[in-house]
Amino acid sequence: MATGANATPLDFPSKKRKRSRWNQDTMEQKTVIPGMPTVIPPGLTREQERAYIVQLQIEDLTRKLRTGDLGIPPNPEDRSPSPEPIYNSEGKRLNTREFRTRKKLEEERHTLITEMVALNPDFKPPADYKPPATRVSDKVMIPQDEYPEINFVGLLIGPRGNTLKNIEKECNAKIMIRGKGSVKEGKVGRKDGQMLPGEDEPLHALVTANTMENVKKAVEQIRNILKQGIETPEDQNDLRKMQLRELARLNGTLREDDNRILRPWQSSETRSITNTTVCTKCGGAGHIASDCKFQRPGDPQSAQDKARMDKEYLSLMAELGEAPVPASVGSTSGPATTPLASAPRPAAPASNPPPPSLMSTTQSRPPWMNSGPSENRPYHGMHGGGPGGPGGGPHSFPHPLPSLTGGHGGHPMQHNPNGPPPPWMQPPPPPMNQGPHPPGHHGPPPMDQYLGSTPVGSGVYRLHQGKGMMPPPPMGMMPPPPPPPSGQPPPPPSGPLPPWQQQQQQPPPPPPPSSSMASSTPLPWQQNTTTTTTSAGTGSIPPWQQQQAAAAASPGTPQMQGNPTMVPLPPGVQPPLPPGAPPPPPCSIECLLCLLSSPNSLCLSPNRAARIPPRGSDGPSHESEDFPRPLVTLPGRQPQQRPWWTGWFGKAA
């Protein structure tokens, strides 16, 4: 045995290396699977042991597929021989060793997962697991050649393909209609020009599913649809009706109440029979022909209705000034129908004669209505301006009514110049015991001065310049007509006279005791009255007073009581006092007392009338005392009533 430096390693035996966990030379390695227990508890059944082993195998295959450790040996010599290569359309090889190994592992894992689901229904396969692409298919032949009049394809597809989609959803299968007639004529096929799959076969429905149960279920529904289309007519096919209704709903043309059957409590109330009643005369609803208020256009009209309508139409046109006055207006049988006559008036006494007609041509127009150049006041000044012109002053009167006085030429309602004026336009007769008017007083003006310029046919009195217009007097207050122009005395009145005429009919009071002044020289106001009357009688007296003076001066007419040169004035009007003349004495003690107590009171004494302030003075306004006059009771006298026209003399002055 060699010792020392010449010793060889063979002389000393080598030591065995220590085993460590990092040593790669160890052949036995521990496999750790996450989620799997490393210690198996005792007392497991065989099914539990099998489930544990199958789950370990599934986890191992999943790990290999996920990491790509397919177990292919790196040495090509250790590999098995490869089959014939298969290439796709792009020139790539499909059956490589890696592809074949992965496919083999996936099939093995799929088998294990199917077994594990059978052992444990609560088992969940891995997230990357996909079942194999193997599918079960079947064909259902469509007898289109035997029944060409039936649209089987339409029944299977349905509106917008909804029927076919519903079957696929229920059976979890894929249904395709193939064969001859499945594609519409003119529709483009494949882009490469090749035939579609199954195009050369008869018309059929191809059903494909993952399981055979789903395929059988889909095939059964397709056969039921084909049988219903063959045995049931189209108008009685419920499936066809439902498809048409669904198509209308999709197109927006569905009527919900077409096939709706209402229950008794949902039905609407019955309509009223009145709404269904139709009139045979006018065609309206809601009434019968006997209750109809309208007449047919062809119904004959009575002569009385025609005459009444013609009369109303002519009256309307006459008021508008477009037609002559109807014949009934000019008749002398009764008073004319005018807007003024239509106003309500108090009834006249039965003893009074009826007023003459407005349009009568047998009598002449009274002279006081004829205006001439010899009068003191011209026509336009009397009426407050020319026709259509402005008023002449603050006391000017409005225009007369065209329908009564003919203010507008050519109007059908013009007054006849040869006939008498209407009753309210006639002047009152002069009193029996009074003299003529002074130059400043011309008596009551005609009624046409008091009527405003109103439209024709309106029948309404308007207010002119803030002054109330006076309507015509009542029939009971009408003054008697003027005396006739002949020499015969006027007839006595047949009716009751107004109070102021009754007072005039009384005999004049006895003259005062004779004295030198009374017998030789008259009083100042009497001198002025006599002189004025005499001078006015020559040419300044109004025409209507001239006519009365001529009638009084005729030899055949009896002389009136009193001064023959005096023309009587209306009651309540006295001539004005001359300038500088003393005022007349009071008529009595009672009159003096009433003057002191109420200066504006009414006294019917001739001397008291001279003290009444004129209308244009600063005295109290009497605008509201035009008509009717109030009754005034004085001591020792009867109640008197002033005539309605006495208030106008102050205005005219």
UniProtKB/Swiss-Prot annotation:
Modified residue annotations for Phosphoserine: S14, S20, S80, S82, S89
CDD domains assigned: KH-I_SF1
Residues bearing the modification Phosphotyrosine: Y87
Biased segments, Low complexity type: 335-350, 515-534
Pfam short name (any one): KH-I_KHDC4-BBP
Bias kind Pro residues: ranges: 418-447, 470-499, 567-584
Keywords noted in UniProt: Acetylation, Metal-binding, mRNA processing, mRNA splicing, Nucleus, Phosphoprotein, Repressor, RNA-binding, Spliceosome, Transcription, Transcription regulation, Zinc, Zinc-finger
Compositional bias of kind Gly residues: 382-394
Motif annotated as Nuclear localization signal, chain positions: 15-19
GO terms under biological process: Leydig cell differentiation; male sex determination; mRNA splicing, via spliceosome; nuclear body organization; regulation of steroid biosynthetic process
Gene Ontology CC terms: cytoplasm; nuclear body; nucleus; spliceosomal complex; U2AF complex
Location of this chain's protein in the cell: Nucleus
Sample GO molecular function, one term: zinc ion binding
Modified residues (N-acetylalanine): A2
UniProt tissue specificity: Detected at intermediate levels in spleen. Lower levels in heart, kidney, brain, liver, testis, bone marrow, adrenal gland, lymph nodes, pancreas and thymus.
Positions of the KH domain: 141-222
PTM statement from Swiss-Prot or TrEMBL: Phosphorylation on Ser-20 interferes with U2AF2 binding and spliceosome assembly.
Region feature Disordered, mapped onto this chain: 1-44, 65-94, 325-584, 611-653
Job description of the protein: Necessary for the ATP-dependent first step of spliceosome assembly. Binds to the intron branch point sequence (BPS) 5'-UACUAAC-3' of the pre-mRNA. May act as transcription repressor.
Subunit structure, as described in the record: Binds U2AF2. Interacts with U1 snRNA. Interacts with RBM17. Binds EWSR1, FUS and TAF15.
Assigned protein family: Belongs to the BBP/SF1 family.
Protein name in UniProt: Splicing factor 1
Organism: Mus musculus
